[in-house]
Amino acid sequence: MIDFIVRIGIIILESFAPMGLYLREAYHMHTYPMNIAGLERELPICKVTDDLYIGAFICFGDAELTVACARELLKLVPADSYDYLFTAEAKSIPLIHEMARQSGAKKYFIARKGPKAYMPDPIHVEDQSITTAGVQRLYLGRDDADLIRGKRILIMDDVISTGGSLLAMESLVAAAGGIVAGKIAVLAEGAAQQRDDIKFLAPLPVFNADGTVKK
């Protein structure tokens, strides 16, 4: 149990924090070095199944990486090609906020993983992600849905993998009456790298249990 808690802590720690490096070395956790938005980072390699391991990309706590990724994401699409930014909670929240700040956007939208008391008449769709067990739902308040109706929406995610979360966000935008103007991500993982309907900053492979790249 202690070992499990420590491993979760490693993922949350900033990649280059001295304590994070110490814990990864002490607990023999494999990492994958990457250049992301011009910054060098090491992603902890985490188990999904016995045959599938992924590199954990976490912006939480890494202000430098968040600012750099937001800057580069904004370069992927023309500013006049969309009206609003849209993402789902939770890992992409720092990114979308920083993108809005840098671009001067006054409003952006976040799909929530549960209905909130402040949401009037929320709409929802189902979502299944590689990093989340089971099927979950994404919710959007009717007030936000009304603002989205008829508008061009740029969907952003931190990592696109199986595409389940991305599809759920597309469905939620469509249910609100919005128009998907583009789909962008920091990283495209595994087979998602071959998609021609997304733009991303860097490819991310998937891994074997020994930390080697899965072919």
Language model region names:
Residues 95-103:
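Short Gly/Thr/Asp-enriched flexible loops that form oxyanion-binding sites at enzyme active sites
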Residues 83, 151, 181:
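Conserved acidic residues
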Residues 106-153:
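Short, glycine/charge-rich flexible loops or terminal/linker lids adjacent to PRPP-binding catalytic cores
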Residues 82-89:
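Short glycine-rich phosphate-binding loop at a beta-alpha junction
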Residues 158, 163:
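Conserved G/P- and acidic residue-centered "switch" motifs that form tight phosphate/ATP-binding loops
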Residues 16-82:
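Active-site-facing substrate-recognition patch
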Residues 89-95:
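Gly/Ser/Thr-rich loops at beta-strand to alpha-helix junctions
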Residues 4-7, 12-28, 33, 167-215:
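PRPP-dependent phosphoribosyltransferase catalytic core
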